[in-house]
Amino acid sequence: MSERVKVAILGSGNIGTDLMYKLLKNPGHMELVAVVGIDPKSEGLARARALGLEASHEGIAYILERPEIKIVFDATSAKAHVRHAKLLREAGKIAIDLTPAARGPYVVPPVNLKEHLDKDNVNLITCGGQATIPLVYAVHRVAPVLYAEMVSTVASRSAGPGTRQNIDEFTFTTARGLEAIGGAKKGKAIIILNPAEPPILMTNTVRCIPEDEGFDREAVVASVRAMEREVQAYVPGYRLKADPVFERLPTPWGERTVVSMLLEVEGAGDYLPKYAGNLDIMTASARRVGEVFAQHLLGKPVEEVVA
C-alpha cells in the first residue's frame, strides 16, 4: 500500500505495547513510526527499538517535534491526557484517547465512529463500554431501550493499578456511554475483578428492558447477531455465549420482558495474555479507529471508509 498516514503511540506500558504489535501486524493505511514513553528502562521502548521503530523516553515533546506524525494514540493516563490533548490539538494532530480523560466525544467503532471523523480528539470510553455498548445499541435500534445494565467481570491479574484507581470513573463513564451511544434512557455499569487462578476470560452480562412490550424478538436476535459479526471484524475473540434470552422479570417498572445477553471476550495474545480480553478490546478498537481516521485523512469519502 503506497499511501499511509504516519502514526505514533504515546505510552509504552502494557496497552501501548500491545497496540504496537497490532499496528505492525495489520498496519492498513497507517505507518507506525514511533513509540514514546517517559521511562528510559521501559520494556515497551526496548521492544520497539528491537523491532526497528523509533523509541524515545522524552514524552510528548518528541512527537510534537515531528510534523509528519498525523495521528497519536495516547495510552498514558487520564491526568496526562488532559495536558496532551491541548498540545496535540495545537500541533494539528489527531488524538485517539485510550484513557478515561474524555476530552473528545466517545466513539464505539460500529456504532458512531463515522459521525466524528471531523474531530481532532476521540475517546474510547472503557473496555466494558467497547464490549457492551454495541449490544445495547443493537437492541435499541429495533426496540428502544428504557434501561440497560452491564456487569463486566475481568481477571484480577489483568487489572493494573490504573484500572483499580479508576473503578468509579469506569462505572460512571460506561453507564453514560450506554445512554449516549447505546441509546438507553438509563444505564448502569458494574465491574468485578475476579481473582480466580487460572485467570478467567473477560465476561459481560448485558440486560436491556425495552420501552414497549410488543417488540419483535426475532428482529432483536438478528440485530444483536449482526452487531456481534461487526465487532468480530476487529476483535475476533468477541463472542456471544448464546442468542439473547427473553424473560419476564420483576423490575422497578413492574413486571417486564428483559433481554439478557452473555458475552465473552478473548484477547488475540499479541502481547497481552489471551485472558486479558478487557485490555485487548481497547487496543483492537483503537487500531480500528486509527485505520478509519487514516483513510479519511487520505481523502476517502466517509461512506466508503472501511477498516
From Swiss-Prot:
Temperature-dependent activity: Has a half-life of only 1.6 hours at 50 degrees Celsius. When TTHB247 is in complex with TTHB246, its half-life is increased by approximately 4 hours.
Any single biological process term in GO: catabolic process
InterPro entries: Acetaldehyde_dehydrogenase, Acetylaldehyde_DH_C, NAD(P)-bd_dom_sf, Semialdehyde_DH_NAD-bd
EC number: 1.2.1.10, 1.2.1.87
CDD domains: ALDH_C
Catalytic activity: acetaldehyde + NAD(+) + CoA = acetyl-CoA + NADH + H(+); propanal + NAD(+) + CoA = propanoyl-CoA + NADH + H(+)
Subunit field text: Monomer. Can also form a heterotetramer composed of two aldolase (TTHB246) and two dehydrogenase (TTHB247) subunits. Upon complex formation, the aldolase shows a 5-fold increase in substrate affinity, while the dehydrogenase shows a 3-fold decrease; the kcat values of each enzyme are reduced by 2-fold when they are in a complex.
The protein's role, per its UniProt record: Catalyzes the conversion of acetaldehyde or propanal to acetyl-CoA or propanoyl-CoA, respectively, using NAD(+) and coenzyme A. The aldehyde substrates can be directly channeled from the aldolase TTHB246 to the dehydrogenase TTHB247. Is the final enzyme in the meta-cleavage pathway for the degradation of aromatic compounds.
Family designation: Belongs to the acetaldehyde dehydrogenase family.
Protein name stated in the entry: Acetaldehyde dehydrogenase
Organism per entry: Thermus thermophilus (strain ATCC 27634 / DSM 579 / HB8)
